[in-house]
Structures are given as C-alpha cells and as structure tokens.
C-alpha cells in the first residue's frame, strides 16, 4: 500500500515520497536498516494568550500525522516554533506592565500544559524567533544582495541619530508569487501581507511586506544591520526552518488560515536564496466553526482550549477533532461534543474489554490492513475511527456474552488479536488511557504476594491448565488455591459448561 497526501501547492493528492526515502516501507525494511527521515515543520503559536480550539485542532492533527508516519516506518524530525516577538505580545506586555519575555514565557508554559492534556508529543525542537535573529539577518541581507528586498529609512527616526531602516520584500521580483494560495497580485488586498505594520510610507509597492521594521528606542527591539527594530512575522519562520531543518524540507504544515499570507510569503522569501523549493509537501488543516460560524472573538463565540477541557474529557476532545477529515472544516456544537463524549466512553469500554481478554499475540491483520488503507488515503481518520468503533463494540459484545452466558463466539486468541488491534489503532492516533494495574501492584495494595512479577498471558494459561488438571484429579483444594492466586493477581476465572475455563483481567 502507498501513502498519498494532499499537497496544497499542487492542489492534488500525491504519493508521499520524502527526499531521502522510498514511497512505501515494509516492517522488515524498517527493522533492517536506517529508517528514511522526514523533515517536518509546523508553524507554532504566537505566545500572547491561551490556546483556543483552532490551535487544539492544528496540533492534534499534526501530532496524528507525525505518529502515523512513524507507524509507517519513517523517522520524523518534527520542529515547531514559538513566535515570541510580535506586536500582539508587545501590546499584552504594555497592558500588564511586564516585559515581552515574561509574557512569552508564561504563555509557552500554558501551551505545554494544555497540549500535554491532549497527549500531544513534544516536538524535537522548539525554536524561538528571539533566538534566531542571526539567521534572519543572513536571509534578509541575502535578499537585499539579490535584489528581492530594499531598505527605507525610517522617517520617524530623529535626525542626527544612528539611522534606522525598514526593510521590505519586493513581491513583484518573485514571478511565482501566489503559487501556493492560487491568488494573483491584482486580486490581492494591499497591506494584507504581514502583522508588523505594513503602512510604511517608503514602500515601493502596496503588496510589498516587511522583513524588518524600525522601532523607537523606547520600545522593545533588537540591534540589527538596519538599526533598532523587530523582525517581520514571515521572515521568522523562514529563518527557523533553515536553521533547524535545512534549505529543503519534506512537510511544511499549519492551519488553512496560514496559506496566505504567511506561507505564501515564507515560500517567496526562501526560494530565491536557496534556488530550491522550501517544502515538497504543503499540508493544511481546516477551520473550527462554532454553530456554523467561524470562531472569532468579535462574534463572541471564542472558546479557549482551557474552557473546553473544563467541560469535556481531553480524549473526547481529541476524538471530536479527529472524527472529521483534517482538511475539512469542523463545527463545534454542544451536540457534537456530547456525541464525542459518548463515543469516547464506548472506546474506553472497548479498551477495558481488550485489557481483560489479555494482550498477548499480534494485532488482527485484517483490521490493521483496513486501518492502513484508511490512513494511507491522506490520513483518513474518519475511516480509521469507524474501524476502531467496530472493534470496540465487538469486544464489548463478546465480553458481555462471556460475563453473562459463560461463552464467546470467538476463540480467546482471536479476541486478543482484535483487542490488540484496537489498542494499536488508538495509540497510533494519539489516544491515551489508564493502564491496568499489574498483578504485583494489586497484590502490593492488598499487602499480599507483593514480590510476584506481573503475569504474562502464557503463564496465566499454564496456571489455568494446572487448575483444570487438579479439578479432574478432584484435588479441589489445589484448584481453589490457584483460583485465589490468580484472583489476587487481578485474573478472574469463568468455568464453562463444556469443562473449559476462560479468564479475564480485572
């Protein structure tokens, strides 16, 4: 099977083949040598406030993509930045009478607290804009030398002092501008291309955007080849990509709101310098709407992730965010979240049944093929989760049969395989759940048998066979002893009418 992904740049699905790797990797190939490397960059948050549900969707989606690539045998170098210098951070700092650094540090800590609850794996690197200034200077100077950027003296700087300059990117110098977003210059709204103020009087073209903006000496900023100032938003990511992953990466990802202007400008800044495509695959996730309207503070429907986590289980929220294909918009409603909460309860019951049936053996091969088929089609989580629900419900039915009627339709080894498939699918999608206490832990809590190691499935089967032999020999004292030993270790035995015995982990 071959993994295909939708590339925003080409507007079509393409076979996924990173620069250093094959398009399909078998388990034997992955185990036998160096795994192909995928270089992946995700645009991170601007750290001036708590994360909202749009952020949650973005980082759950790319966490899922990373996990699935690793499942398929790739090594993923995952980099996600923090924008820790920005006019919004400056405004928040002035409001609170704090430094920009203090504001940034606090909200970086809040970010990790929220994302940890969603079970999002940490990135390999978290570069920060303030720590990548030298790389920004090098890029801007290279763009100046190649004629793609120009400087304009800041008219507000006092005469006689060291001059300060704004530096702008000359959009019309790059003939492919608009290739990512599909927009043409004549269709674009002037001034819509950056977050550092774009109204500079010296701009040669209304479409040009800031690479560096001069700042008054009284404002936070940095010394640069162009005097005191702050970087433009877009140059920050271009510099951090190059500094951490090189000139040419496999995946550049983010929310659909970043396609234009942010990613369009990143591409335009980077490619004239390197002569190479910045990224082979550009991937973007859809918006979060609230009751059919785009989520925004102005509409009063803005929900922070912290508020949502106060109402719903983190894994129910993760389920809600993955039940819709990542490129489609998702509508947050109370009914949708209640459905996700009930769905997570069903999956938890399935997980519990899988744990009780035992986890020995390999996952059901048919289920895993179906999972890979769904996910190989541009990370099709709706199909993958539908399969997980089928497995969970089947395990619940079989568990109810065994509990109430003493038998199951499926043989024990098949139940264990289906349980293993459910757990592997959910783990690959990034879900987490409490692990069952091992026998020695339960015994220790009871003050009994504390030194016994956790029992493997094979050892349980061995003890069950010994008990069966004792019962046949009418050695009921020994049979009872084995039953009590297993009970203390969290194993329940169910004697069936045909003389066999089934077991469940508590």
Swiss-Prot record:
Q: Which cofactor does it need?
A: Zn(2+)
Write out the residue ranges of the motif 'HIGH' region.
45-55
> Which Gene3D superfamilies would you find in this protein's record?
Cysteine-tRNA ligase, C-terminal anti-codon recognition domain (1.20.120.1910), HUPs (3.40.50.620)
The EC code for this enzyme is 6.1.1.16
Binding annotation for Zn(2+)? 43, 237, 262, 266
Main location, first listed in the record: cytoplasm
Could you confirm whether the keyword Zinc appears in this record? yes
**InterPro entries named in the record:** Cys-tRNA-ligase (IPR015803), Cys-tRNA-synt_Ia_DALR (IPR015273), Cys-tRNA/MSH_ligase (IPR024909), CysS_C (IPR056411), Rossmann-like_a/b/a_fold (IPR014729), tRNA-synt_1_cat_dom (IPR032678), tRNAsynth_Ia_anticodon-bd (IPR009080)
**UniProt motif ('KMSKS' region) ranges:** 294-298
Molecular function terms from GO: ATP binding; cysteine-tRNA ligase activity; zinc ion binding
Q: What UniProt keywords apply to this chain's record, in alphabetical order?
A: Aminoacyl-tRNA synthetase, ATP-binding, Cytoplasm, Ligase, Metal-binding, Nucleotide-binding, Protein biosynthesis, Zinc
Give the reactions, separated by semicolons, that this protein catalyses. tRNA(Cys) + L-cysteine + ATP = L-cysteinyl-tRNA(Cys) + AMP + diphosphate
Which Cys-Cys disulphide bridges does the record give?
none
Assembly information from the UniProt record: Monomer.
NCBIfam families listed in its UniProt record: cysS
Q: What protein family is recorded? A: Belongs to the class-I aminoacyl-tRNA synthetase family.
Name of the featured protein: Cysteine--tRNA ligase
Source species, please? Synechococcus sp. (strain JA-3-3Ab) (Cyanobacteria bacterium Yellowstone A-Prime)
């Amino acid at each position: 099977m071959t993994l295909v992904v939708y590339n925003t740049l080409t507007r079509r699905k393409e076979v996924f083949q990173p620069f250093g790797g094959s398009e399909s990797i078998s388990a034997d190939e992955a185990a036998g040598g160096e795994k192909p490397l995928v270089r992946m960059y995700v645009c991170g948050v601007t750290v001036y406030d708590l994360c909202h549900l749009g952020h949650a969707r973005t980082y759950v989606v790319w966490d899922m993509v990373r996990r699935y690539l690793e499942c398929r045998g790739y090594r993923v170098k995952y980099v996600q930045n923090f924008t820790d210098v920005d006019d919004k951070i400056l405004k928040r700092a002035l409001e609170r009478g704090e430094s920009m650094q203090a504001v940034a540090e606090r909200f970086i800590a809040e970010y990790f607290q929220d994302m940890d609850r969603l079970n999002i794996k940490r990135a390999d690197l978290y570069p920060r804009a303030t720590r990548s200034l030298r790389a920004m200077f090098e890029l801007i100077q290279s763009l100046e030398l190649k004629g793609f950027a120009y400087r304009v003296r800041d008219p507000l700087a006092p005469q006689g002092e060291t001059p300060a300059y704004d530096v702008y990117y000359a959009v019309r110098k790059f003939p492919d501008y608009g290739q990512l977003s599909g927009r043409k210059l004549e269709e674009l709204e002037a001034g819509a291309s950056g977050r550092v103020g774009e109204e500079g009087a010296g701009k040669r073209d209304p479409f040009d955007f800031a690479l560096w903006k001069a700042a008054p000496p009284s404002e936070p900023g940095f010394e640069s080849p162009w005097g005191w100032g702050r970087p433009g938003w877009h140059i920050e990511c271009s510099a951090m990509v190059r500094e951490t992953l090189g000139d040419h990466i496999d995946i550049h990802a983010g929310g659909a709101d970043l396609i234009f202007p942010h990613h369009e400008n990143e591409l335009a800044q980077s490619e004239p310098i390197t002569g190479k495509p910045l990224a082979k695959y550009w991937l973007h996730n859809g918006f979060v709407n609230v009751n059919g309207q785009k989520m925004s503070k102005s509409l009063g429907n803005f929900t922070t992730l912290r508020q949502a986590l106060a109402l719903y289980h983190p894994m129910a929220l993760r389920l809600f965010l993955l039940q819709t294909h990542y490129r489609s918009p998702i509508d947050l409603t109370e009914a949708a979240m209640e459905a996700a909460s009930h769905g997570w309860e069903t999956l938890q019951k399935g997980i519990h049944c899988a744990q009780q049936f035992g986890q020995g053996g390999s996952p059901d091969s048919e289920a895993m093929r179906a999972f890979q088929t769904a996910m190989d089609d541009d990370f099709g989580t709706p199909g993958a989760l539908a399969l997980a629900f089928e497995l969970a419900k089947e395990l619940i039915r079989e568990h109810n049969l065994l509990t109430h009627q003493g038998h199951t339709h499926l043989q024990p080894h098949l139940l264990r395989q289906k349980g293993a498939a459910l757990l592997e699918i959910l783990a690959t999608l990034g879900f987490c759940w409490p692990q069952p206490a091992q026998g020695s832990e339960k015994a220790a809590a009871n003050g009994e048998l504390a030194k016994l190691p956790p029992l493997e499935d094979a050892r349980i089967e061995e003890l069950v066979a010994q008990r069966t032999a004792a019962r046949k020999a009418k050695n009921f004292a020994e049979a009872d002893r084995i039953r009590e030993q297993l009970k203390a270790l969290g194993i329940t035995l169910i004697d069936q009418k045909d003389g066999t015995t089934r077991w469940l982990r508590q």
